Regions:
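A conserved P-loop NTPase coupling/switch region
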Residues: 117-122, 129-199, 203
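Structural recognition of the conserved hydrophobic beta-strand(s) that form the central parallel beta-sheet
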Residues: 72, 344-351
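Short aromatic-centered micro-motifs
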Residues: 106, 278, 364
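Nucleotide-state sensing region of NTPase/ATPase domains
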Residues: 48-142, 146-154, 158, 220, ...
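Conserved lysine of the Walker
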Residues: 36
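Walker B catalytic acidic pair
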Residues: 322-324
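Conserved NTPase motor "head" modules and their coupling/switch loops across ABC/AAA+ ATPases, GTPases
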Residues: 1-31, 45, 64, 185-203, ...
């Protein structure tokens, strides 16, 4: 996958910007708060209309304007081999609540606009930003989200299963919560309904865990090899799936803990309570990893995510790396600079000195104005 060009209008602090990226490395330099991450975020919106930083529609549109507009030309690897002169042309708009078309809409090759979420899967990308460091130190929810987000991009059917599981889980938790006096269901009725919900949860939960395990079998060797190279063999990373149940065992676990869940008033078991353990030299990274080690762990995971997607789909995602070199020693920086030249990569940095000798395109962002160096 390649981004051939991008035109940005009225997006956050960017009034107008034109980007013609290189085939491999494109660097956006500038001081903090100038709009570098905004430009990276604009590229990420092409993956399905969502921001990796969050934000309401009005927050994405430049102050005083009704719309933000992104116009991009993209080329898939298969197109590049077979139809090099026919890129996809994408137009994405973000409208404020009081505009003529509120919300996020996208049009591909002149077709009628549709919800931008429909772009999912058409522009594969992997993003790293400093907020992703919480993958290491944060709660298990963030690590589960990392796995599930990757799987949703790779397998559209996974999103269907995942949403169904969450919907049934919500119904179960509502049933388990204690109702106000006089509104409680009869005990027998409550247990009968709980059994029905658990049956559905077991079916969907088994599918979720199985897909996570299979994906991790592919991801783990890639991530661990990345970390070994990043650390020059000084440290060893391991990934383990911390499961609550063995394959085929969720139904029995739900039945065994049913009374405990009733007393607790909430669901206590299932894939929504599992974790991805990250270890450095056999020790939990969430406890012992330094800032630099945390960054190296997450970068190893993100590069592995891109490599795994390339193997599974035949399309290498575009890499978007925000402030990636901070808190890394010179050896790790040099390794990353080498890896960045393998596929199309966009990277932001406050300091351009590390990139001036590379073959990539270098831009500078200043007050929302983009210029080529």
């Amino acid at each position: 996958m390649r981004l051939l060009s991008l035109e940005v209008t009225n997006y956050r602090n960017i009034a107008s910007a034109s980007l013609t990226p290189g085939r491999e490395l494109t660097v956006i330099c500038g001081n903090n708060g100038q709009g570098k991450t905004n430009l990276l975020e604009a590229i990420w919106l092409l993956t399905g209309g969502k921001s990796f930083r969050g934000g309401k529609d009005a927050e994405l549109v430049r102050r005083g304007e009704p719309f933000a507009v992104l116009e991009a030309s993209t080329l898939r690897a298969q197109q590049e081999e077979q139809e090099p002169d026919e890129p996809n042309r994408v137009r994405l708009t973000v409208g404020t609540p009081d505009s003529q078309r509120p919300g996020r809409y996208a049009s591909v090759n002149g077709a009628a606009p549709r919800r931008a979420a429909g772009l999912a899967g058409s522009f594969p990308a992997v993003v790293f930003d400093p907020g992703h460091l919480s993958l290491v130190k944060g709660a298990p929810e963030g690590r589960r989200k990392f796995l599930d987000a990757a799987l949703c991009q790779l397998y559209p059917g996974y999103l269907t299963v995942y949403r169904r599981y969450l919907r049934v889980l919500q119904q179960k938790n509502a049933l388990l919560r204690r109702s106000p006096a006089g509104q409680e269901r009869p005990y027998a009725e409550k247990m009968a309904l709980l059994e029905v919900l658990n049956t559905e949860l077991a079916a969907q939960g088994e599918a979720i865990q199985q897909r996570r395990r299979t994906y991790l079998e592919r991801l783990a060797p890639l991530a661990c090899a990345n970390y070994e190279e990043l650390s020059h063999g000084a440290e060893r990373m391991e990934l383990r799936y911390a499961a609550q149940f063995e394959p085929g065992g969720l139904a029995a676990l739900l039945k065994a803990r049913q009374n405990e869940e009733v007393r607790a008033g909430q669901s206590l078991c299932g894939p929504h309570r599992e974790d991805l353990e990250l270890l450095l030299d056999g020790q939990p990274a969430r406890v012992f990893a330094s800032q630099g080690q945390q960054r190296s762990v997450v970068l190893s995971l993100k590069m592995a995510e891109a490599a795994a997607a390339a193997v599974i789909t035949g399309e290498h995602p575009v890499l978007l790396l925000d402030d990636v070199l901070s808190e890394l020693d010179d050896g790790r920086k040099q390794y990353l600079l080498t890896r960045m030249r393998e596929k199309q990569t966009f990277v932001t940095s406050c300091d351009d000195t590390a990139f001036l000798k590379t073959d990539g395109e270098v831009y500078r962002m200043n007050g929302g104005v983009l210029s080529r160096v």
